[in-house]
Each structure stands twice: as C-alpha cells, then as structure tokens.
Amino acid sequence: MTTVSYVTILLTVLVQVLTSDAKATNNKRELSSGLKERSLSDDAPQFWKGRFSRSEEDPQFWKGRFSDPQFWKGRFSDPQFWKGRFSDPQFWKGRFSDPQFWKGRFSDPQFWKGRFSDPQFWKGRFSDGTKRENDPQYWKGRFSRSFEDQPDSEAQFWKGRFARTSTGEKREPQYWKGRFSRDSVPGRYGRELQGRFGRELQGRFGREAQGRFGRELQGRFGREFQGRFGREDQGRFGREDQGRFGREDQGRFGREDQGRFGREDQGRFGREDQGRFGRELQGRFGREDQGRFGREDQGRFGREDQGRFGRELQGRFGREDQGRFGREDQGRFGREDLAKEDQGRFGREDLAKEDQGRFGREDIAKEDQGRFGRNAAAAAKKRTIDVIDIESDPKPQTRFRDGKDMQEKRKVEKKDKIEKSDDALAKIS
C-alpha cells in the first residue's frame, strides 16, 4: 500500500468520527430543548422556572439552601448548640419554680401593651364601619354620581334618564357608559375602593386592609398584625411579638425574652440574663455579672469587680482598686498602698511627701512626688526629714528661686575673680 492509500484511510476514519460527534451533539440539543419545552408548558411557565430543578435559567435558587456548609454549621453538630439544653441542670433551673420565669409574662404591662387597647390592634379586624361612614372616599360614587359641571337641579341632568323613548330613537353610546357596569366604581376591576383585584380596602388579592394575600392588617401571607408568614404581632415566621423564627418576645431563634439562640433574657447563645455564651447575668463567656470571660462583676477576663484580667475592683491587669498593673489605689505600675494622694508615675510604698525631686528614692515624701520616685527604704533604716510648710515659709524653695540664687552667686564669684585678676596685674606692672 502506498502512502496515498494510508492517508485516504485516515481521512475517511476522521470524517466518520466527526460526523458521529456532530450527530450526538444534535441529539443532546434536541433532547434538552424538548425537556425545556415540556417543563415550560404549564399555564404559568414562569412559576416553575428554576424552582425545583437547577437549570441554566436560575442556578441561584438552590444555591446554599441545603448543600452549603454554612446552612447547617452549628445547628446540630456544634457542641455549643446542645450545650446545657437538656442534660445541664442549669437548663431547668428557674424555669417553673423561679419567680423570674413568670415575671412579666401576664402581669407586666409591657406584655399586654397595645394588644387590646391599641387602636391599631382592632383596626380592620371585625368591621371598618366607622371609617367607611366618616371617610368621604367610601361613599364616593356608590349611590349617586355627582357632576361638578351638571348639578342635580339642572334640567340637563335628568334629561332622558327615565323617560320612555320612541321606538326608532337610539341612545348615545356615551349615555350608558359606566352607569350600571363595574366601571362606575373605583379600583381597576372590582368594587368599593379596592386594590387590584379584591374588595373593600384591600391589598392586592385580599380583603379589609390586608397585605398581599392575607386578611386584616397582615403581612405578606399571614393574618392579624403578622410578619412575613406568621400571625398576631409576629416576626418573620413566628407568633406573638417574636424575633425572626421564635415566639413570645424572642430573639432570632429562641423563646421568651431570649437572645439570639437562648432563652429567658439571654445573650447570644446563653440563658437567663447572660452574656454572649454564658448564664445568669454574665459577660461574654462567663457567669453571674461577669466581664468578657470571668464571673461576678468582672472586667474583661477576670472575676469579682475586676479590671481587664484581674479580680475585685482591679485596674487593667491587677486586683482590688488597682491602677493599670498594681493593687489598691495605685499609680500606673505600683502596688499595695502606693503613693495614694498625688504620687508620681512609678512611685512605690511610703514615698516621701511634699516636693520630692524627679528621680529621688528612699526618704522621698509621699505627697507631690516627682515623676519616677521609687520605694522608700525600710522604716528602721530610713531617715526623717523636716517637712517645710510652704505656706508658712516666707521664702519657699522652688526650682525657679533656686536658679536665680545660683545665678546671683555665680555673678558674685565671677566679679571676685575679675577683681583678683586686676589686683594681680596691677602688682606685676
């Protein structure tokens, strides 16, 4: 076989392969178009578009509904979700025996506020008669058709209205327009001040001051002061003053004065006057009047009236009425009875009083110390200093006065040196 025959065979095989691929592609397109036509052959083709099948038209419909890990994240697998819900003794603590559980549920005026006394509560629930009688728009065009240019007293108004016409006479087409048809009443197609398709002060499809599909001051689909889908002063899906999904003064998912996920005056995930994750008047993670992570009137991480990390009325890191790092009425870095009453920046323990220097140590006074004064020596070793009463001293020591005195002294010394040098020169000459 020659080279030409080999080339011919290869070209023939290539053409057959390409032809089969083209046929398969056409079959797939025809099948997909047929399925698409079948799926959109309902009465309302837009209704089913992208609802239950992830199609090319609307792939966003199912995106993140059940397959997204963020949807199920922390709902059942997270240990924080089940923490303390049924097994923890804190879960049942104070639910039925604690007076705080029933506090404000029926006796609290906030519970009944606006439920029956609020005029918005009864608005449109049983009848809207008062509004209809008083509202001039209600009777507009119901029993009489008023004409501003042609009052009832004019003869033109009654002309030809009830008189019998002769056999050959014909009325003008404009005469009967709107007299007994549905066009005589406002609204698009309906009657009595309707919305688009309904009746009697409706929304789009409903009745009596409704939302889109419901009744009686509803939300989108519900009834009676609802949210989007719920009933009776609800949130988005719940009932009775709810949050997004819960009930009865809830947070986002919980119940009964909750936070986001918890119950009974909780924080974000906790219970019973909690912080974010804790319980019983907690901070962010702790319990019982805590700070962020601690307990009992804490700071950010500590406990019992703490600062940021310490305990018991602390500063930032210390304890018990501290400064930033120390304790008990300290300065910035000192501890335990440090320089109470005007201490310096770093002063410690029994510093001297009144007019200490900038870096003085040991035997420095307590009050009005300098910037970096430090600990006094032991009581047995320290020397006593005479405290000068500034008010009684006629010439108190100050930095400015000391400087002037030093200048005067130097001037005198310089003058003496000059005089001595002049005397020496005179003797030499």
UniProtKB/Swiss-Prot annotation:
InterPro entries on file: Antho-RFamide (IPR052690), FMRFamid-related_peptide-like (IPR002544)
Location of region: Disordered: 230-429
BP term (GO), one: neuropeptide signaling pathway
One GO cellular component term: extracellular region
Biased composition (Basic and acidic residues): 230-371, 392-429
Keyword Secreted: yes
Propeptide, residue positions: 23-233, 239-241, 247-249, 255-257, 263-265, 271-273, 279-289, 295-297, 303-305, 311-321, 327-329, 335-342, 348-355, 361-368, 374-429
Origin: domain of life: Eukaryota
Localization annotation: Secreted
Reported function: Not known but it could act as a transmitter at neuromuscular synapses.
UniProt record similarity statement: Belongs to the FARP (FMRFamide related peptide) family.
Protein name (Swiss-Prot/TrEMBL): Antho-RFamide neuropeptides type 2
Species annotation: Anthopleura elegantissima (Green aggregating anemone)
Origin organism lineage: Eukaryota, Metazoa, Cnidaria, Anthozoa, Hexacorallia
